């Protein structure tokens, strides 16, 4: 009797589990330091400024950064977390402290992971900077995906379009018209160029208050923006793949930077596909802020806002109160949700 052929999902799951087992084995000696009370100093507050696979860098109130282990009881520790930690009396295997607890988060950004459920990216954010680029083309669908995440996380968003120096006058006009779609519904937008410096002063001023995070696909120029804003950091920049047009991942760990003019900036690894599997139809619908005024006024309570009679959203589109491109992207998201929704239960990222 021949063996049943594994599906692609089953093969990926086996490969992922195997990789995780190898990773745990390879790093077991690094992460399993048994810190005893007599090896540690007093409890103190700190902020996670870098998160690695098995360690985290914590900054104390005096600005000192210490590499720490994590207590095994901690479910999730991400950049931006306020933590309670203790400094070791000596350095062990390159580690000088241990994180004991994570303070309650004001907010967090999460994304679904097929194998690990909901995965936190960063915590305690004041604004999300959605970075897009004009090449290969400006994707409003991707921008809308990020905006749904921002709205569901209740975190203000700013749309930044990089590489404006590559635009012809005609293309610049087209991009400006696309950005007006978002300006009309209350989103702040910036058309910038890290290469020419266009509008970089406005971006720098925006970042000077609170903690911001750059999100966006690889290759949109997040590292180039950081090099401009923080030249001393010299973040590694990558070249676009000439074959696919997709960028190479150049940031391997999430990091928090302090800006000289004030404010903090978090840079996270680029993500080519920002899944929304953990959100249901109602959450995605609520992620479109211009829909809010019309929701609840459709003829039928279970209106899907597609071909339903008496749909207030469709009427608003026809009357020019909702942009048709946004409405089209909304249904693309709903369709993709129906096609790719995993049956697994997404556990909390806390």
Curated annotation (Swiss-Prot):
Monomer. Associates with 30S ribosomal subunit, binds 16S rRNA. It comes from Histophilus somni (strain 129Pt) (Haemophilus somnus). GTP binds at residues 162-165, 216-224. It is found in: Cytoplasm. The lineage of its organism: Bacteria, Pseudomonadati, Pseudomonadota, Gammaproteobacteria, Pasteurellales. One of its GO terms (biological process) is ribosomal small subunit biogenesis. The keyword Nucleotide-binding applies. Residues 1-30 are annotated as: Disordered. Residues 7-20 have a biased composition (Polar residues). Residues 21-30 have a biased composition (Basic residues). Pfam families: RsgA_GTPase. InterPro entries: G_CP_dom, NA-bd_OB-fold, P-loop_NTPase, Ribosome_biogen_GTPase_RsgA, RsgA_GTPase_dom. It is an enzyme of class 3 (hydrolase). This is Small ribosomal subunit biogenesis GTPase RsgA. Belongs to the TRAFAC class YlqF/YawG GTPase family. RsgA subfamily. Binds 1 zinc ion per subunit. Its EC number is 3.6.1.-. Zn(2+) binds at residues 298, 303, 305, 311. Gene3D superfamilies: Nucleic acid-binding proteins (2.40.50.140), P-loop containing nucleotide triphosphate hydrolases (3.40.50.300), Probable gtpase engc, domain 3 (1.10.40.50). Residues 106-274 form the CP-type G domain. GO terms for molecular function: GTP binding; GTPase activity; metal ion binding; rRNA binding. Its cofactor is Zn(2+). One of several proteins that assist in the late maturation steps of the functional core of the 30S ribosomal subunit. Helps release RbfA from mature subunits. May play a role in the assembly of ribosomal proteins into the subunit. Circularly permuted GTPase that catalyzes slow GTP hydrolysis, GTPase activity is stimulated by the 30S ribosomal subunit. Keywords: Cytoplasm, GTP-binding, Hydrolase, Metal-binding, Nucleotide-binding, Ribosome biogenesis, RNA-binding, rRNA-binding, Zinc. Transmembrane segments: none annotated. One of its GO terms (cellular component) is cytoplasm. Coiled coil: none annotated.
């Amino acid at each position: 009797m021949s063996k049943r052929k594994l599906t692609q999902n089953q093969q990926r799951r086996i490969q992922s589990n195997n990789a995780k087992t190898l990773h745990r084995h390879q790093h077991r000696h690094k992460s399993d330091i048994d810190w005893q009370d007599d090896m540690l100093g007093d409890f103190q507050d700190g902020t996670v400024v870098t998160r690695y696979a098995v360690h985290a860098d914590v900054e104390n109130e005096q600005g000192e950064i210490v590499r720490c282990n994590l207590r095994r009881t901690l479910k999730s520790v991400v950049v931006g977390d306020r933590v309670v930690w203790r400094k070791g009396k000596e350095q062990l295997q390159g580690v000088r402290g241990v994180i004991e607890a994570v303070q309650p988060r004001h907010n967090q950004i999460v994304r679904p992971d097929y194998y690990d459920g909901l995965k936190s990216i960063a915590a305690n954010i004041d604004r999300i900077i959605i970075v897009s680029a004009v090449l290969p083309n400006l994707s409003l669908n991707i921008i809308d995906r990020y905006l749904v995440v921002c709205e569901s996380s209740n975190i203000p968003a700013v749309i930044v379009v990089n590489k404006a120096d590559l635009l012809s006058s005609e293309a610049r006009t087209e991009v400006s018209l696309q950005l007006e779609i978002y300006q009309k519904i209350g989103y702040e937008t910036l058309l910038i160029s890290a290469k020419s410096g266009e509008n970089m002063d406005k971006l720098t001023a925006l970042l000077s208050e609170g903690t911001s995070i750059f999100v966006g696909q690889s290759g949109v120029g997040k590292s180039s923006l950081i090099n401009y804003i923080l030249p001393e950091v010299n973040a590694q920049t990558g070249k676009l793949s000439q074959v696919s047009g997709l960028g190479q991942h150049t940031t391997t760990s999430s990091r928090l930077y302090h800006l000289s003019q004030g404010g903090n900036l978090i840079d996270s690894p680029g993500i080519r596909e920002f899944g929304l599997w953990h959100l249901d139809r109602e959450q995605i619908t609520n992620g479109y802020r211009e829909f809010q005024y019309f929701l609840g006024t459709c003829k039928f309570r279970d209106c899907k806002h597609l071909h339903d009679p008496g749909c207030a959203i469709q009427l608003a589109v026809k009357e020019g109160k909702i942009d048709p491109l946004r409405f089209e992207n909304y249904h693309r998201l709903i369709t993709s949700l129906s096609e790719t929704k995993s049956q697994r239960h997404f556990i909390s990222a806390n």
